[in-house]
């Protein structure tokens, strides 16, 4: 298969259909712009399965996603889109960079969900962008904000039912050949912070990032909690 993009933890191939791609999830985890690397067995299939369930749930809420279906344990067929070079972060609690860069303590509930933009460029260390800078890049930030908040509303309720607090998450978007906007990339514990309600237990990549434990059992726990919801 023709490789379109070789990412840190995923490879994107051209599909048989010119308007489709195949995304392969690898048993690999990175942090610190690739400075930390590990290869946890089974991690790729877990992220692929979790993403597929979440994409399907969001599609039922009329949120357009690039996802079509899974093929095998760690691959999915997706609609081909041109990825926007932005990482869009939605925050419900203070964690990560917002703690490092403000006076907020980790875990502080935010008065309302905050949507932030970061340039998708490792060489520049993914700098924070203002909405005006997003506009200067040629993109209207409002559709990204609106869709991200819709995603947050749904996922926050879904994870609450699972006993999980959705602290924050990252999404990426792309435009198809007709100029329509789609949620793309993935939504998995690699791109979310998930804390067990009422405890300090975590189910996300911070376990690896902060050397606090094995991510595979944590990701498997998220998949186990998601699967009963997948059939609803």
Where are these regions (language model features)?
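A short glycine-rich, hydrophobically flanked beta-strand micro-motif that places a catalytic Asp/Glu
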Residues: 68-74, 161-175
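C-terminal helix-cap and adjacent tail motif
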Residues: 108, 187-232
């Amino acid at each position: 298969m023709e490789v379109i993009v070789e990412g840190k933890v995923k490879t994107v191939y051209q599909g048989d259909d010119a308007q489709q791609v195949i995304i392969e999830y690898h048993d690999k985890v990175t942090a610190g712009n690739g400075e930390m690397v590990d290869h946890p067995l089974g991690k790729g299939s877990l992220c692929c399965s979790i993403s597929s369930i979440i994409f399907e749930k969001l599609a039922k809420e009329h949120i357009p996603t690039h996802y079509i279906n899974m093929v095998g344990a760690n691959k999915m067929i997706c609609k081909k889109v041109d990825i926007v070079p932005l990482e869009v972060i939605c925050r419900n609690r203070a964690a990560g960079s917002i703690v490092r860069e403000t006076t907020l303590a980790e875990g502080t509930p935010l008065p309302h969900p905050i949507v932030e933009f970061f340039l998708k460029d490792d060489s520049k260390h993914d700098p924070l962008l203002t909405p005006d800078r997003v506009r200067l890049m040629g993109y209207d930030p409002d559709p990204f904000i609106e869709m991200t908040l819709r995603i947050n509303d749904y996922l926050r309720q879904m994870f609450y039912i699972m006993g999980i607090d959705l602290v924050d998450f990252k999404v990426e978007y792309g435009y198809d050949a007709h100029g329509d906007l789609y949620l793309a990339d993935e939504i998995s514990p690699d791109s979310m912070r998930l804390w067990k309600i009422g405890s300090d237990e975590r189910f996300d990549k911070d376990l690896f990032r902060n050397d606090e434990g094995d991510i595979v059992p944590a990701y498997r726990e998220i998949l186990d909690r998601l699967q009963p919801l997948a059939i609803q």
